[in-house]
């Protein structure tokens, strides 16, 4: 797919590429309108207005597609496009941007089955990829996401099952990781 289409991989699969753990069931991508047209010609495309995205299935796998000036994410897509990196042949957001996108997903899906997976991805990024927290702070300020650092701290403090999902069951180790993660957050 990455050889045929120009897209930015976001969501759980982008987290997986960065951390090498916890795969995702569906694929989330960002594309420009030209690429959306190519997808439309090749696959059945469904517009989901209330979620401001498009959906399709490719080889039985659900793909959520986000486009500039239509899709709503924590950070404008045009800004995400400027803050990417390449990894294993895929273009993905920088870790700080991906962390914010995962926080947005967690807030949007709060109290659903999928929000726990979002929290797992958030912790996984923090533990295994160490995003640049100065860049994170700068970005949340720039886009008026002032509640995000506080929510990030809450996610770290309240995490229990999320650590189990990551295979971390030793309570001492969990406590040490939480302490280290909180120390890494800036006020």
Protein language model regions, located:
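Compositionally biased terminal segments of proteins
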Residues: 1-187
């Amino acid at each position: 797919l990455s050889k045929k289409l120009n897209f930015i991989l976001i969501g759980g699969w982008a987290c997986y590429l960065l951390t090498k753990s916890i795969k995702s069931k569906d694929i989330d991508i960002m594309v420009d309108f030209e690429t959306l047209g190519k997808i439309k010609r090749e696959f059945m495309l469904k517009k989901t207005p209330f979620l401001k995205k498009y959906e399709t299935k490719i080889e039985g796998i659900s793909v959520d597609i986000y486009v500039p000036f239509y899709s709503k994410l924590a950070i404008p897509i045009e800004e995400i496009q400027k803050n990417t990196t390449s990894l294993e042949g895929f273009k993905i957001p920088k870790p700080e941007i991906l962390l914010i996108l995962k926080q947005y997903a967690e807030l949007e899906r709060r109290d659903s089955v999928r929000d726990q997976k979002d929290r797992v991805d958030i912790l996984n990024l923090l533990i295994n990829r160490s995003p640049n927290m100065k860049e994170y702070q700068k970005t949340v300020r720039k886009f008026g996401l002032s509640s995000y650092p506080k929510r990030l701290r809450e996610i770290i403090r309240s995490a229990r099952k999320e650590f189990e999902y990551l295979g971390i069951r030793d309570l001492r180790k969990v406590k040490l990781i939480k302490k280290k993660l909180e120390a890494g957050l800036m006020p």
